[in-house]
Regions:
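Conserved AMP-binding/adenylate-forming
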Residues: 52, 68-115, 248
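Conserved AMP-binding A3 loop
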Residues: 55-56, 193, 202-228
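Conserved C-terminal "lid"/linker of ANL adenylate-forming enzymes
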Residues: 474, 499, 504-510, 538-575
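Conserved AMP-binding/adenylation subdomain of ANL enzymes
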Residues: 225-244, 252-338, 347, 372
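Conserved pre-ATP/AMP-binding loop-to-beta segment of ANL
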Residues: 41-42, 170-206, 213, 238-244
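Conserved ATP-binding/catalytic segment of the ANL
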Residues: 409, 416-417, 421-476
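N-lobe entry segment of adenylate-forming
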Residues: 1-73, 77, 96, 101, ...
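Structural core segment of the AMP-binding/adenylate-forming
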Residues: 32, 73, 100-179, 507
């Protein structure tokens, strides 16, 4: 990976890490991508699991062709290009092509509904939209009137073109490439756009797609660059050119993008994309075959594999006795650890877990057997890293210490005893929310602190312990941001619903509803009929929601929810 040119001075101060940097961006983010492609030209780069492999030189050619497509169709530096589809090599190439051309990428979760995709494309002012197979069948181009065209990610064919320039460029792309490079295309010819200053906008990552709730997080190049510096420092000794890695998390999510794709690509690794739904069986098979050297995951992936492949073997009377026998216990634990290690491919240095809360039972079990894992903490607004510790230094229950270039503090000040809001600032922090000054002012204060909305404490050694969320946002099993108010807003508009709360129970969402009993009485409805009506409401609601926002059940409350003087429901009373 390209080496950092920034210089840093770290010091512990009030349980935070301060930083000072030299803003010389000569070795910029896009320069890192360019250097990686040139340096690892003949290395395997990207593989769609069970599919075709692209070498770094193949990636360079595809990027160059997309640059020609952008230029010939009139895309300017700073224009927005949206991408919405499952993880695959061509998604990664299109993303890199966007940034290295000088355009702004707008990654969109493929799980968003069609209306959410339309809203994001329109709100972001995107000029082009790249879509995957499934997304292409769901969206309506007429609801995105300002885009020049839609490009199919699997083969870069045009789904729709609204300009002659775009149509001509795509139909003659190979010819145009041949005219620009009549003899050959070599690595010496790769010359990408370099960002002009650290605060230049690199991408906009939306936390939600619903009109009225959309927040497009503006990620500058300094944040992308700083996350690379962090990852290089944390993993440089364990991640090497040619190593196999797996991309499971959505690349449209900052966690998956930064640490399952960009870091590995900059290091010269061979990245395998799981193009199918990452079920426990598919993931376990991929781990066994690919044998990744670093595993980045959300808790659910780890928990399901352990619960399915490991814990059943331990739930026997004989094993329980052995684990309690002092002179046998350590040998048994070592054997169990080896089995768990094999379940994840058997070659990795550590598993880094983040994106959602980790199950305490599983975390305690992994510590008990001495398994190499750690838990990090981040946010989309920090692109994403806030804190991390190597697994050797991981403190149970914590999510590490402030990452390089970042400060963390607790407000109000009594960080070691009383939980307060976690605040962070540094190079990783966003510029703000796109076209949303009010939300930006609420999230970023005048001193540059990002207010996370999370409650926590910091111990004497700087380890951060999250105690809860002051915001109402929930986290899906794969780290998706879930805003209950949006679901409640839709639920409250359905028949017989007066008010509702959406709560999370393990990885399931449940709607708590206070029905309109007066209306039910007027219709002579029994309680059984009200329950049937609520089940129909659940089905109706789920048809409009992405998979991770669907309700598993609706529970009826026979009394109104308790409220504050401002008539807000006291959410903390309901679980």
């Amino acid at each position: 990976m390209c080496r950092k040119v920034c210089t840093f001075a770290h010091q512990k101060e009030n349980c935070a890490i301060s930083f000072a940097i030299n803003n010389d961006m000569e070795n910029s983010f896009n320069a890192c991508i360019e250097e990686s492609i040139k340096k690892y030209w003949n290395f395997d780069a990207l593989t769609d699991y069970k599919g075709v492999t692209l070498q770094y030189q193949d990636v360079a050619r595809k990027i160059e062709k997309l640059h020609i497509l952008f230029e010939e169709s009139g895309i300017q530096k700073g224009d927005k290009i949206a991408l919405c589809g499952r993880n695959m090599s061509n998604w990664a190439v299109a993303f890199l092509a966007t940034l290295t051309y000088g355009a702004v990428a707008v990654p969109i979760l493929h799980e968003f509904t069609a209306d959410q995709v339309h809203n994001i494309v329109n709100h972001s002012e995107a000029k082009l939209l790249f879509v995957g197979d499934v997304v292409s069948t769901q969206i309506d181009p007429e609801k995105m009137p300002d885009i020049l065209g839609i490009v199919n990610i699997p083969d870069y064919s045009l789904m729709i073109s609204r300009t002659e320039k775009l149509t001509y460029a795509r139909e003659n792309l190979n010819l145009l490439f041949g005219q620009k490079y009549p003899k050959y295309f070599r690595k010496e010819m790769v010359n990408y756009y370099k960002e002009q200053n650290p605060d230049e906008l690199a991408l906009i990552n939306y936390t939600s797609g619903t009109t009225g709730f959309s927040k497009g997080v503006m990620i500058p190049y300094r944040a992308m660059w700083s996350n690379l510096i962090f990852a290089n420092g944390a993993l440089d000794k364990h991640l090497h050119p040619g190593d196999n890695t797996i991309s499971i998390l959505p690349m449209a999510h900052m966690y998956g993008m930064a640490f399952e794709f960009i870091q590995e690509f900059a290091t010269g690794c061979h990245i395998f994309f799981l193009t199918r739904i990452p079920s426990p069986a598919v993931v376990a098979q991929a781990f066994a075959e690919i044998k990744p050297v670093i595993i980045i995951a959300v808790p659910l992936v780890i928990e399901k594999i352990i619960r399915k492949k490991v814990l059943p073997k331990l739930d026997t009377p004989a094993m329980k006795i052995l684990l309690k026998t002092p002179f046998v216990s350590q040998k048994v634990r070592d054997k169990i650890r080896d089995e768990v290690y094999k379940a994840f491919g058997g070659r990795f240095y550590e598993i880094i877990i983040g994106g959602a809360a980790f199950n305490q039972e599983i975390e305690q079990f992994l510590h008990f057997i001495g398994f190499p894992f750690t838990v990090g903490y981040g946010a989309t607004e920090c692109a994403p890293i806030i804190s991390y510790n190597d697994w050797h230094d991981h403190v149970p229950g914590s999510c590490g210490k402030a990452a390089v270039n970042m400060e963390v503090k607790i407000d109000p000040v009594n960080p070691r005893k009383i939980p307060g809001e976690i605040l962070t600032r540094g190079m990783n922090v966003m510029l703000g929310y796109f076209k949303n000054e009010e939300a930006t002012k609420q999230a970023l204060d005048d001193e540059g602190w990002y207010h996370t909305g999370d409650l926590g404490v910091i111990d004497a050694w700087g380890n951060i312990f999250i105690k809860g969320r002051s915001k109402n946002m929930l986290l899906g099993a794969s780290g998706q941001n879930i805003f209950p108010e949006e679901i409640e807003d839709a639920l409250n508009s359905l028949p017989l619903v007066v008010e509702s709360i959406v709560v999370q129970r393990e990885d399931k969402l449940v709607g708590l509803v206070y029905p309109d009993f007066d209306e039910a009485k007027a219709q002579n409805l029994s309680m059984d009929q009200i329950k049937k009506a609520m089940e129909q409401n659940r089905l109706t609601l789920n048809a409009t929601q992405p998979a991770y926002c669907k309700l598993a059940a609706i529970e009826i409350h026979e009394e109104e929810f308790e409220k504050t003087p401002k008539k807000s429901i006291k959410r903390y009373l309901y679980k």
